Amino acid sequence: VRGAVCPYVSRGGLKLEKALRDFGVKPEGFVCSDSGASTGGFTDCMLQNGARQVYAVDVGHGQLAWKLRNDERVVCMEKTNFRYMLREHIQDDLDFASVDVSFISLKLILPVARELLSDSGEAVCLIKPQFEAGKENVGKNGVVRDKNVHISVVEMIVDFCLNNGFDVLGLDYSPIKGPQGNIEYLIHIKKSN
C-alpha cells in the first residue's frame, strides 16, 4: 500500500502549503525568500503557487534539490546565514518571506527579514519551541513536551513581532511535527508602517 505522493521536493512544502491556504496568502508574482531552504520544500511550494523569484537561503550547501537549482526563478544562496543578509544581496524588495530555521531564534532572523521586505511585505515563520525556550526547558532528545513552555514561547514570539515592526495576522499549528516529534507553529506576519 502506498501513501499519497508529496507534491514538493520535501515534506516541508506541506507546512507552507497549509499556511498559504489557511492564512490566505497568494504569492503569485511575488519576489520571495526561503530562509532555511534546505532541500527546498518551501521554495517549491512558492514556485508552484506562482512566485516570480525565490531566494533560497541556507547555511548549508549541496542540499537544494536539483530541479530547483536549475530553475531560473531560484537564486540559490548556499553557505549564507540569513541573519547577516543585507539589502545589497538581493535585487528587489521581498514581497514575501518564509522562515524555517533551526538552532537559532526567530528573534535574530525577523529584524533582518523586516529590512528586506517591501512596505507591504508579509512572512510566514515556523516557531520551533526547542530553539526558543532555553536549554532548561528542553527535554531529552531536544523535545519540548510542557504545554506551558509552548504557550510562553508562542507568546514571546508574538510579542517580539508586535514590538519590532510587524502585525500578527495569524497563528496555527504546523501540519507536520519537527524531528523527534516536536510540535511547531506557523505565524503569519506583515510589516507594519
Label each region the model flagged:
Residues 53-108:
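S-adenosyl-L-methionine
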